[in-house]
Amino acid sequence: MNTRSLTRFVLAGALLASFKASAVPGLWQQGYGQGNAEYSVTDASGKMFTINCTGNPDQNGFYQHSVFLTQTNNRIVSSHDDGTTITVVMNHQQYAIPSSLGWRNGDNAWYSFIMDIRKARQFEIYVNDRKAGTFSADPTNAAKVLPTPGDCGND
């Protein structure tokens, strides 16, 4: 794990700790800190799915947005983790979350995910092809809270 990933985990942990204290299952909430907007939803068991939209571009000028899954044992899995694939299934479609952005297929996949997560009433998370959680979400709340592709993309 490199220093950049470690910094993200520390930031994510701080933000997630504040989210967990007041998280109502099924309602998206937003937090912001150090150039990162984070959008999280919890399930009834306490698992949390987070979309991280960074405002800090990498050395090539690309925004390396990501997702996190915080499990009930507080283990955090990130789409940036080496050897980890995260797939979101919603509305009978799968969305493989790219491990990095700044290339056409990755940016297109991220755009589709951000567009469609706003409309999902329920979605499943798979980590390395194993189901890791099922989340229900209120679409009205999602439309108010979640980012648009322009707020969380590489346009």
Regions found by a protein language model. Give the residues of each.
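Bacterial N-terminal signal peptides that target proteins for export
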Residues: 1-10
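N-terminal signal peptide c-region/cleavage motif recognized by signal peptidases
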Residues: 18-20
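A generic "folded-domain core" signal
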Residues: 22-155
